[in-house]
């Protein structure tokens, strides 16, 4: 019996916080074979790093089956954690790690998938990153206006 190949998904994500901490938003795009799904959300009191990470978590939660996922982000915090730091954080039981609640949520959301992070320079003309930034900023502004 031949094992079926996993779908290759690209997850673009960005986060924004007005005040850091302050109202914040995240925006993301899931891409598969040319199809795109945008998503966004936010919180009343948060930081940019929390929103960067929430954007990835929420995107992973939208996937309905195990996939190979490339996370594309302008957050070196998120990309380096995914690719380099997370295993040692787990071994050290997250001692001295910020946003432990979200990293544990990330681990749960990422568990069925193979996830790798790719860093892109922010505000550098990368269309998907620019769109995610727009979604995140719009959500942060919407939340700020509602307070």
Curated annotation (Swiss-Prot):
Pfam family, one: RNase_H
Residues reported in the UniProt entry to bind Mg(2+) 2: 14, 133
Binding of Mg(2+) 1, residues: 14, 52, 74
Cofactor binding remark: Binds 1 Mg(2+) ion per subunit. May bind a second metal ion at a regulatory site, or after substrate binding.
E.C. number(s) listed in UniProt: 3.1.26.4
Assigned keywords, A-Z: Cytoplasm, Endonuclease, Hydrolase, Magnesium, Metal-binding, Nuclease
Catalytic activity: Endonucleolytic cleavage to 5'-phosphomonoester
PROSITE patterns for this protein: RNASE_H_1
An annotated GO cellular component: cytoplasm
Record's keyword annotation contains Hydrolase: yes
Residue ranges annotated for the RNase H type-1 domain, each copy included: 5-141
Domain of life: Bacteria
Keyword Transferase applies: no
Database matches in CDD domains: RNase_HI_prokaryote_like
Gene Ontology MF, one: nucleic acid binding
Cofactors named for this entry: Mg(2+)
GO annotation (BP), single: DNA replication, removal of RNA primer
Family membership noted in the UniProt record: Belongs to the RNase H family.
PANTHER family for this protein: RIBONUCLEASE H1
Function: Endonuclease that specifically degrades the RNA of RNA-DNA hybrids.
NCBIfam families: PRK00203.1
Name of the protein: Ribonuclease H
Gene from which this protein is expressed: rnhA
